[in-house]
């Protein structure tokens, strides 16, 4: 009698464990408030805030806009001039960054990881070693145009433009991610400098800065200290004596950490020659060779991951130690395309299968290019919101909601942003100059379902279902299913013929 009872209890425990495991796997994002995605109209958005720094420009979109609130994200575009340094900072939300132009280096500061890049011991002119503290730091990573870079929440990072042209980078912050346990406001915490709040309108910034300045000066006055302009980094609010004790330095050096009277902003110009950090030096040929080797290693590691999944071996979701984590994948290289149609264009994707850290961040991305007059067939995103940033050119875009209403029917141009909510259907058609975009998606493995073409939902339906659903002859149903042999990207009919048909109507 006891055995059946024990068996029942054991089975119940297994079911509970499996249920909890499923919740843990699918719990990457916080729930939306009711009605947050009840959007009757979408707009192509321009940046609403612009901040000029010493060596660059920061432009952001209003994170309180209904479209971005629906997707649960914030977006900022940073332009870093040659020899410009984006100061070290971390965010309350995980970030995906797309490098739209330029190249440079970045450092990501994982806590507890060793300083694997170190300076060699130098010798004096007499050939004898001098006693000095060698510089050591964590790994330096190169980036170039077309790269997607992942930054986990709370992990500090910096970027430097070591090229001859500006770096333009699009940062998406997933504020609805469970890694963010603050509110839904995007927050950047700077380790240096006196930066402005990228997401706050200039008038509000000036008021808040003035209020904090008064409070800080009042506190200094109570301690009999000389009044100074308040900095805006994480060290600014501490007493200089505490910092001096923590770093074992004098008080004057500690005050320099607080960046008082520093008006350079969050992107500063490196003085003199280029930033001197410890990193391997490559020629262009060596760098291209190393990038080819890296792509080969990524393909091999992807093959190994597939084999391990088929073999039933469990993994940690990252496949690497934290300290050697891959953070970058290039999706701008045409040879990297996942979908390619010779006359229409190409699409590349990055997800947790080819960049495992995205399983942690619960994000993915798509990079697309449509040639002149080409069409990205109507489709919907099954499991993610899509935030589309137009990189080059123009496209006609239509978006349809669950009521069959057109919520967007307009042109999307370079530099604009469009949010496409989950399950809303969308179609894109390039103008004469073509169209290129990057889409950030709020799922580690975002899935797309086409409405037309070889892999579409219509193609998958039986003819009899189409005949009865649309009240059409069987021949028309067959044409709907089989007239388009391409899967996703197709060559559109000429715009002139479309204009003629519209004129006839």
UniProtKB/Swiss-Prot annotation:
The keyword Signal applies. Induction: Up-regulated during nut development. Residues 1-24 form the signal peptide. Pfam families: Cupin_1. Residues 118-132, 208-219, 238-249 are annotated as: IgE-binding. It comes from the Eukaryota. Residues 219-228, 282-316 have a biased composition (Basic and acidic residues). A motif (NGXEET) lies at residues 316-321. One of its GO terms (molecular function) is IgE binding. Coiled coil: none annotated. Belongs to the 11S seed storage protein (globulins) family. Homohexamer. Each subunit is composed of an acidic and a basic chain derived from a single precursor and linked by a disulfide bond. Seed storage protein. This is 11S globulin seed storage protein 1. It comes from Carya illinoinensis. The lineage of its organism: Eukaryota, Viridiplantae, Streptophyta, Embryophyta, Tracheophyta.
């Amino acid at each position: 009698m006891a055995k059946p009872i024990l068996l029942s209890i054991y089975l119940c425990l297994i079911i509970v464990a499996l249920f909890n495991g499923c919740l843990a796997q699918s719990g990457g994002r916080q729930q939306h408030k009711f009605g947050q995605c009840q959007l009757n109209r979408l707009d192509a958005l321009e940046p609403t805030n612009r901040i000029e720094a010493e060596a660059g420009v920061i432009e952001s979109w209003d994170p309180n806009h209904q479209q971005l609130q629906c997707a649960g994200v914030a977006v900022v575009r940073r332009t870093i001039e040659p020899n410009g340094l984006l100061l070290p900072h971390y965010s309350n939300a995980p970030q995906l960054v797309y490098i739209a132009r330029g190249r440079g280096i970045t450092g990501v500061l994982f806590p507890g990881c060793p300083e694997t890049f170190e300076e060699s011991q130098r010798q004096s002119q007499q050939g004898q070693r001098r006693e000095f503290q060698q510089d050591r730091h964590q790994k330096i990573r190169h980036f170039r145009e077309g790269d997607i870079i992942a930054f986990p929440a709370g992990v500090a990072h910096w970027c430097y433009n070591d090229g001859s042209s500006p770096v333009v980078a699009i940062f998406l912050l997933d504020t609805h991610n469970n890694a963010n346990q603050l509110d839904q406001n995007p927050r950047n915490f700077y380790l240096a400098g006196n930066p402005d709040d990228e997401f706050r309108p200039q008038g509000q910034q000036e008021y808040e800065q003035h209020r904090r300045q008064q409070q800080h000066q009042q506190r200094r006055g109570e301690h009999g200290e000389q009044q100074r302009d308040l900095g805006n980094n994480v060290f600014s609010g501490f007493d200089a004596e505490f910092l001096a004790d923590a770093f074992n330095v004098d008080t004057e050096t500690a005050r320099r950490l607080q960046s008082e009277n520093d008006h350079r902003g969050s992107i500063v110009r490196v003085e003199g020659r280029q930033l001197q950090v410890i990193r391997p030096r490559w020629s262009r040929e060596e760098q291209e060779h190393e990038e080819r080797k890296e792509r080969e290693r990524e393909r091999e590691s992807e093959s190994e991951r597939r084999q391990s999944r088929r073999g039933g071996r469990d993994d940690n979701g990252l496949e690497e130690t934290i300290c050697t984590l891959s953070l970058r994948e290039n999706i701008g290289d045409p040879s990297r395309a996942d979908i390619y149609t010779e006359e229409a264009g190409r699409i590349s994707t990055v997800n947790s299968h080819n960049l495992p850290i995205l399983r942690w961040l619960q994000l993915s991305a798509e990079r697309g290019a449509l040639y002149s007059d080409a069409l990205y067939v109507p489709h919907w995103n099954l499991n993610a919101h899509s935030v589309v940033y137009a990189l080059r050119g123009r496209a006609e875009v239509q978006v349809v909601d669950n009521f069959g209403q057109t919520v967007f029917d307009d042109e999307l141009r370079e530099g604009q942003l469009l949010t496409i909510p989950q399950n809303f259907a969308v179609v894109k058609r390039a103008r004469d100059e073509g169209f290129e975009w990057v889409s950030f998606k709020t799922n580690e493995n975002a899935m797309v379902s086409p409405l037309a073409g070889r892999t579409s939902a219509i193609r998958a339906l039986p003819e009899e279902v189409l005949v009865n659903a649309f009240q059409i002859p069987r021949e028309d149903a067959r044409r709907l299913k089989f007239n388009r042999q391409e899967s996703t990207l197709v060559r559109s009919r000429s715009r002139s013929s479309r204009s003629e048909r519209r004129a006839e109507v």
